[in-house]
Amino acid sequence: MECKLVNLSNNDVGTTQLNPLIFSVEQKLSILHDIVRWQLAKRRAGTHKVKGISDVSGTTAKPYSQKRTGRARQGSLRSPQFRGGGVIFGPIVRSHAYSLNKKVRKFGLKVALSLKYLNNQVIILNNLNINVKKTSEMCKYIQNFKFSSFLIVGDYEDSLLRAARNLHYVNLIKPIGLNVFDILNHECIMLTSDALRYLEGRLL
């Protein structure tokens, strides 16, 4: 599939070929749902923790006699029914991550890229070699494209990252870090020609 090649000023500089095995695959949205859930589960810190009956500070003595008081029998003041007692089956520190097949993850990336291409939300850039040092300069380049948010994929200089860092609707990412959640979370995906070649090697 032929696609036009532009620079960050949105001027045509040529054409490039997009592989239909990446940008024109069957749309299976359930795959995207599975992968986003997997990504969000992996990023959870899992540091939630409450004290159980064995963690609560307090005496181990029986509160009062088993019989003759007329009250319900109790064996510990650290039981959950008492104020300051432990929590039963409460959250503990754990990992929420689970495994997902590599084939599924790879196919999901193709589905996400195909979805963006189908909606005309993929732009192929010749490179990111621009001399910008200020956010205002980066903003002028971005305003050449009529989208609400941008994910720029390619090898970039630190100066470009610093210039774009303060724009909440612009994110830069290396080709190796491209993922389904970020693709779906941005309206427009900008790929450099080098990033495109890398993705072909990664996904085919």
UniProtKB/Swiss-Prot annotation:
InterPro entries: Ribosomal_uL4 (IPR002136), Ribosomal_uL4-like (IPR013005), Ribosomal_uL4_dom_sf (IPR023574). One of its GO terms (cellular component) is ribosome. Part of the 50S ribosomal subunit. It comes from Wolbachia sp. subsp. Brugia malayi (strain TRS). One of the primary rRNA binding proteins, this protein initially binds near the 5'-end of the 23S rRNA. It is important during the early stages of 50S assembly. It makes multiple contacts with different domains of the 23S rRNA in the assembled 50S subunit and ribosome. Pfam families: Ribosomal_L4. Keywords: Ribonucleoprotein, Ribosomal protein, RNA-binding, rRNA-binding. Gene3D superfamilies: 3.40.1370.10. GO terms for biological process: translation. Belongs to the universal ribosomal protein uL4 family. The keyword Cell wall biogenesis/degradation does not apply. It comes from the Bacteria. The lineage of its organism: Bacteria, Pseudomonadati, Pseudomonadota, Alphaproteobacteria, Rickettsiales. GO terms for molecular function: rRNA binding; structural constituent of ribosome. Residues 53-77 are annotated as: Disordered. Residues 56-67 have a biased composition (Polar residues). This is Large ribosomal subunit protein uL4.
